[in-house]
């Protein structure tokens, strides 16, 4: 408990003597309600306005009262102000001491602490502090109300004194009481909040009871499949008497040994053309196209028109329509090298028509010939006042039957399809209830918790990276 004294005029003795009113508090008091606070504030402003009009006769009357043995009210209130300041400091100290932090119990590192017991102790401490605060609140409210009534009655007993000066003093007294009660309300709010429970701490485990992890042998890095890129060239002959089988045999025996490239396949086409599939790099295809041996044997070689290279232009604004895109592509990138008619034969739009309602941007795919490909190989195209990133689209074969690489479904040796989600046979990914498991990574001893043929697959990602590096 904290005791404090407020110096005030005792109305029961005519205001001639000064008494003391003890004030006890266990913790703090709460603030006035909103309506009471507003009322006191309005009263204080009105009294301050009246006090500003204090006149000299009022001061003379106060001096006369003091000479007759009546103490000056303002001086008495000044002492009351000082006492109230002491009371506010004492209340603050009481609030700080009302809920001392609980001493931390000794922690046994071999046994996990009981979190529920610690929480109960903290809750009990907070409840006791709140009850003490509310008990002190009632006592303080009663004391402050009685103090205000006694001061006002003392002022009324002073006859012949101008009330303006007394109103100013009462206003100052009310403001100080209001500040004290607001401060006590803040302290009570802080006391009413329960302390946070202690954080749970894990028990230290000894080496004896620590779980033993199984020893796993290190997995060697798996061998990744070598990337195979397939390009095709078509050979035609002007001699109608020469069959497709004869053309293929002539190329196999008379042309292929002098090409200096690895020929993957030589087969006959229905139109009596011959198709040469080479692989490993674009440079090998260029060697086949530049060979003069074909002309010496009366053969014409050209790249397969069905496999024109493709270029992707990224993040094109959908506000630019397809026709406007192609027109700007020619004017800003190909105008100095080919006419509009030549451009339309060399560059074809593969992406279906888009509009502004399809989103903010769209990736545009173009099918180009070798001449246009050399121009777009710089990596940037200019449309209107924008510059867009572009890159050649590299084709990598992936089998959707066995989910392997380097061959198509028509070339797959496996007869039954596997699920793309778990890599097992007998069902499809749409009806699969098994967890995600990459068949390719599992066979190579790598983490397999991802989809096959996805960006999360390290094997498929390495394949794409190597293919892109060759271009």
Curated annotation (Swiss-Prot):
The keyword DNA-binding does not apply. Residues 40-50 have a biased composition (Basic residues). One of its GO terms (molecular function) is nucleic acid binding. InterPro entries: Znf_CCHC (IPR001878), Znf_CCHC_sf (IPR036875). Residues 438-457 are annotated as: Gag-like cysteine motif. A zinc finger (CCHC-type) spans 397-414, 417-434. Keywords: Metal-binding, Repeat, Transposable element, Zinc, Zinc-finger. Signal peptide: none annotated. Residues 27-39 have a biased composition (Low complexity). Residues 13-57 are annotated as: Disordered. The keyword Zinc-finger applies. To corresponding ORF of B.mori (R1BM). This is Uncharacterized 50 kDa protein in type I retrotransposable element R1DM. It comes from Drosophila melanogaster (Fruit fly). The gene is R1A1-element\ORF1.
């Amino acid at each position: 408990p904290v005791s404090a004294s407020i110096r005030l005029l005792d109305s029961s003795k005519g205001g001639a003597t000064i008494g003391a009113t003890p004030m006890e508090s266990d913790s703090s008091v709460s603030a006035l309600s909103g309506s009471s606070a507003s009322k006191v504030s309005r009263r204080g402003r009105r009294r301050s306005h009246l006090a500003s009009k204090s006149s000299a006769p009022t001061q003379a009357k106060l001096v006369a009262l003091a000479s007759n043995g009546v103490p000056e009210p303002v001086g008495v209130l000044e002492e009351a102000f000082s006492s109230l300041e002491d009371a506010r400091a004492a209340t603050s100290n009481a609030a700080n001491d009302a809920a001392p932090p609980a001493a931390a119990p000794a922690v046994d590192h071999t046994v996990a602490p009981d979190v529920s017991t610690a929480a109960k102790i903290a809750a009990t401490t907070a409840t006791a502090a709140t009850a003490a605060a509310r008990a002190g609140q009632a006592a303080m409210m009663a004391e402050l109300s009685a103090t205000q009534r006694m001061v006002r009655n003392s002022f009324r007993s002073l006859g012949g004194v101008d009330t303006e000066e007394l109103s100013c003093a009462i206003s100052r007294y009310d403001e100080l009481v209001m500040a004290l009660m607001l401060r006590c309300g803040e302290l009570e709010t802080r006391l009413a909040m329960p302390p946070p429970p202690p954080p749970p701490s894990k028990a230290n485990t000894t080496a004896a009871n620590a779980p033993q992890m199984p020893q796993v042998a290190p997995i060697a890095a798996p061998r990744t499949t070598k990337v195979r890129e397939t390009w095709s060239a078509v050979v035609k002959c002007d001699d109608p008497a020469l069959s497709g089988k004869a053309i293929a045999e002539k190329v196999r025996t008379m042309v292929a040994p002098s090409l200096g490239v690895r020929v993957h396949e030589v087969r006959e086409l229905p139109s009596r053309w011959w198709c040469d599939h080479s692989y490993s790099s674009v440079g090998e295809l260029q060697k086949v196209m530049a060979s003069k041996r074909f002309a010496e044997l009366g053969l014409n070689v050209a790249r397969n028109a069905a496999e024109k290279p493709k270029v992707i232009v990224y993040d094109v604004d959908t506000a630019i329509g397809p026709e406007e895109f192609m027109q700007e592509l020619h004017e800003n990138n190909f105008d100095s090298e080919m006419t509009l008619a030549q451009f339309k034969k060399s560059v074809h739009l593969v992406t279906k028509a888009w509009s502004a309602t399809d989103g903010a941007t769209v990736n545009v795919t173009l099918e180009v010939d070798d001449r246009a490909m050399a121009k777009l190989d710089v990596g940037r195209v200019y449309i209107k006042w924008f510059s867009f990133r572009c890159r050649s689209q590299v084709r990598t074969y992936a089998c959707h039957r066995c989910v392997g690489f380097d061959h198509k479904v028509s070339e797959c040796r496996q007869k039954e399809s596997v699920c793309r989600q778990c890599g097992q046979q007998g069902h499809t990914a749409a009806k699969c209830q098994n967890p995600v498991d990459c068949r390719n990574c599992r066979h190579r001893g790598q983490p397999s918790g991802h989809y096959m043929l996805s960006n999360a697959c390290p094997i498929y990602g390495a394949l794409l990276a190597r293919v892109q590096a060759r271009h």
